Amino acid sequence: MGLSDGEWQLVLHVWGKVEADLAGHGQEVLIRLFKGHPETLEKFNKFKHIKSEDEMKASEDLKKHGVTVLTALGGVLKKKGHHEAEIKPLAQSHATKHKIPIKYLEFISEAIIHVLQSKHPGBFGADABGAMNKALELFRKDIAAKYKELGFQG
């Protein structure tokens, strides 16, 4: 399940592109998530009333949350699999406070991959795509293990 040094290099290279515009990427990821899986919107009190893509694009709260999500994920990715300290509080809040099922983390992972493919085709070829998918799968697996420790059946 672990990634090679070369795979981590690919992940972190494209992640540098994400960090250059966290707000734009985060907004696109959340819009893609909510459009593809409208049921996920119910978990977000701040924007569950938003229905149209135009409203989503205009929402400062949505943009801010996109930055929060991608900043946290970037912190995890930069640890190259040694992310216990980063994962623990994320799992705690997502299991006990927000009650986010692992399935929703799969959905947002798909949205992230799609946004990277569309925004960075030159930097996100098959190898980078495969590496990022592995990194996101590792993240989800480790969150799921923490969920289990916490007794959350998400």
Curated annotation (Swiss-Prot):
Sites where the protein binds nitrite: 65
Superkingdom in the source lineage: Eukaryota
Catalytic activity reported: Fe(III)-heme b-[protein] + nitric oxide + H2O = Fe(II)-heme b-[protein] + nitrite + 2 H(+); H2O2 + AH2 = A + 2 H2O
Binding positions for heme b per the UniProt entry: 94
UniProt keyword terms in alphabetical order: Cytoplasm, Heme, Iron, Metal-binding, Muscle protein, Oxidoreductase, Oxygen transport, Phosphoprotein, Transport
First-level EC class: oxidoreductase
List of residues that carry Phosphoserine: 4
E.C. code: 1.7.-.-, 1.11.1.-
Single GO BP term: removal of superoxide radicals
Annotated Pfam families: Globin (PF00042)
Modified residues (Phosphothreonine): 68
InterPro entries according to UniProt: Globin (IPR000971), Globin-like_sf (IPR009050), Myoglobin (IPR002335)
Binding annotation for O2: 65
Gene3D superfamilies: 6.10.140.2100, 6.10.140.2110
CC per GO annotation: extracellular exosome; sarcoplasm
Subcellular location: Cytoplasm, Sarcoplasm
Main location: cytoplasm
Oligomeric form and interacting partners: Monomeric.
Annotated function: Monomeric heme protein which primary function is to store oxygen and facilitate its diffusion within muscle tissues. Reversibly binds oxygen through a pentacoordinated heme iron and enables its timely and efficient release as needed during periods of heightened demand. Depending on the oxidative conditions of tissues and cells, and in addition to its ability to bind oxygen, it also has a nitrite reductase activity whereby it regulates the production of bioactive nitric oxide.
Name this polypeptide is given: Myoglobin
Organism listed in the record: Castor fiber
